[in-house]
């Protein structure tokens, strides 16, 4: 099931709704993907270090229960929250992370963004930038798994103001360059990109016999 949330969405209520959905689901609960475009916010994961918040300015900061460091969400970025039953699908964490990355890479390829790839030791999706082909981040991952149920998900930069990323060390990496699809010469509607990403995510989930989605 794919569900679009009200745009722009405040981060904290969406996070709490994910937690409530996860706490209330059972073995037969269908998987869902929630798509949204957030109001500007910095989020700090469980490993987040305050020193990676360089200059937050007026943008609110929310500490949350996903893995990872600090990132930015805001208008022009589509976030796909993946409420998936990993135990039912028979997926381990590493396989699940790869599934998220593959879905983002496939979506970028679908819309004509060239060269999307992984970067060893740095989760997320990257694209080559400039003559030297330096890898710049275009999609970030953050997950939480509770009793075999996953929530949080993947954020893909479509066409956004990238300047707030200068106020942080994105994902804890000093000097990491962040880009969006528009910077790669591809301007597409955020809803279209989000829908394709969600479809790829759901299609990639192994579905045991008799399961519903």
Curated annotation (Swiss-Prot):
Superkingdom, natural source: Bacteria
Family annotation (SUPFAM superfamilies): Class II aaRS and biotin synthetases
Documented EC number(s): 2.3.1.181
Protein's UniProt keywords contain Transferase: yes
Segments forming domain BPL/LPL catalytic: 27-209
Protein's pathway: Protein modification; protein lipoylation via endogenous pathway; protein N(6)-(lipoyl)lysine from octanoyl-[acyl-carrier-protein]: step 1/2
Binding site for substrate: 66-73, 140-142, 153-155
Gene3D superfamilies: Bira Bifunctional Protein, Domain 2
Active site residues per record: 171
Principal location class: cytoplasm
Transmembrane spans: none
Protein's GO biological process: protein modification process
Swiss-Prot/TrEMBL catalytic activity: octanoyl-[ACP] + L-lysyl-[protein] = N(6)-octanoyl-L-lysyl-[protein] + holo-[ACP] + H(+)
Enzyme class: transferase
Family matches, as InterPro entries: aa-tRNA-synth_II/BPL/LPL, BPL_LPL_catalytic, Octanoyltransferase, Octanoyltransferase_CS
GO function terms (MF aspect): lipoyl(octanoyl) transferase activity
Keywords for the protein's UniProt record, in alphabetical order: Acyltransferase, Cytoplasm, Transferase
Annotated localization: Cytoplasm
An annotated GO cellular component: cytoplasm
Pfam families, per database record: LplA-B_cat
NCBIfam families registered for this protein in UniProt: lipB, PRK14342.1
Function: Catalyzes the transfer of endogenously produced octanoic acid from octanoyl-acyl-carrier-protein onto the lipoyl domains of lipoate-dependent enzymes. Lipoyl-ACP can also act as a substrate although octanoyl-ACP is likely to be the physiological substrate.
Alphabetized HAMAP family for the sequence: LipB (MF_00013)
Note: In the reaction, the free carboxyl group of octanoic acid is attached via an amide linkage to the epsilon-amino group of a specific lysine residue of lipoyl domains of lipoate-dependent enzymes.
Name of the featured protein: Octanoyltransferase
Organism: Bordetella petrii (strain ATCC BAA-461 / DSM 12804 / CCUG 43448)
């Amino acid at each position: 099931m794919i569900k679009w949330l009200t745009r722009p969405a405040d981060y904290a209520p969406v996070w709490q709704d994910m937690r409530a959905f996860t706490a209330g689901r059972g073995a037969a609960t269908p998987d869902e993907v929630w798509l949204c475009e957030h109001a500007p916010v910095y989020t700090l994961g469980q490993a987040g270090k305050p020193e990676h918040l360089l200059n937050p300015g007026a943008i609110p900061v929310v500490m949350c229960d996903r893995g990872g460091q600090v990132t930015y969400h805001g208008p022009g970025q589509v976030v796909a929250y993946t409420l998936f039953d990993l135990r039912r699908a028979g997926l381990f964490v590493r396989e699940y992370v790869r599934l998220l990355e593959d879905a983002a890479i496939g979506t970028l390829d679908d819309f004509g963004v060239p060269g999307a790839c992984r970067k060893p030791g740095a989760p997320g999706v990257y694209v080559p930038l400039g003559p030297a082909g330096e890898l710049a981040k275009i999609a970030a991952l953050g997950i939480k798994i509770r009793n075999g149920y996953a929530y949080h998900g993947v954020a893909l930069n479509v066409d956004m103001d990238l300047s707030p990323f200068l106020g942080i060390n994105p994902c804890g990496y000093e000097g990491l360059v962040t880009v969006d699809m528009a910077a790669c010469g591809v301007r597409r509607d955020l809803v279209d990109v989000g829908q394709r990403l969600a479809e790829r995510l759901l299609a990639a989930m192994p579905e045991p016999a008799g399961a519903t989605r």
